[in-house]
Amino acid sequence: ALHFVGHHVDHELVENIEADCGDRLERMREGEPRRFLLTMGGAGAQRELFKAVVDHMVPMVRSGEATLFVNLGDHRENWEWLEAELGSIRSEVHLHTTWDETRELADELRTSSTSGIHVFVYDNTFHAVYATNYLMRVIDVMITKPSELAFYPVPKILNERVGGHEAWGAIRSAEVGDGTVETRTIPETLHAIDLLTREEDLLTMYADGIVKNKAIGIYDGAYKSVALATGTVW
């Protein structure tokens, strides 16, 4: 049998949707720097786009418009590449390399403001992957290609696909109202960053959409799969 169960999402993300989206809108109303999380896959694809996003956001970070979190996963070669590309900007970057440090920072950000550029790189695959999930709750917008992260309940800028099948991740996110359509060029991605930083309507729409999606079960896929596997009722 084939069952449509919804998006597969970690329990703590689904459970805290209302609180986390409320915090995003409160930070926006208070004029705090917009918090962006930029993710890079292990293959290190899209380096030109990645560097363009960082370069574009440096002045925004310096002016207090935005804070940038960059998760490079467990591939240190990606950090070595980015560090070389940063040049003089390197002195402005806060590097985080352990899970304990990441967790402490994220926990602080639930109740405090933040600034600057923060880069995360690990020597452990599990820490590398889960850092994105853990940081997701305390950021305002995630910038990612439309892979599996396109289905997560966080406002998203979906940049150009790498695999052809990823087009559907962006389509789905746009359908349910929790992220942009696929921004197929670097200028489109940078324009989306500007809009989500300097305007309030898109972030409000995505946050409200995520809360509504939870109410109708869109993010209940993992729960329903377990129920089907165990013969229980969800």
Task: Locate predicted features.
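Catalytic binding pocket for nucleotide-activated donors in carbohydrate/polymer assembly enzymes
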Residues: M142-E200
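Short, aromatic/basic amphipathic alpha-helical patches
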Residues: A1, E80-S91
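Donor nucleotide-activated moiety binding/catalytic core segment of transferases
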Residues: E92-A150
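A nucleotide-sugar donor-handling region in carbohydrate enzymes
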Residues: A1-D55, N71-R76
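Active-site/ligand-binding-proximal alpha/beta "capping" segment
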Residues: H11-E26, R35, F126-L135, D140-V141, ...
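C-terminal amphipathic helix plus adjacent low-complexity
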Residues: L109, L195-W234
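Glycosyltransferase donor-sugar binding loop
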Residues: T67-E80, T97-D100
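Residues that mark the start of a beta-strand
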Residues: R35-L37, T67, P155
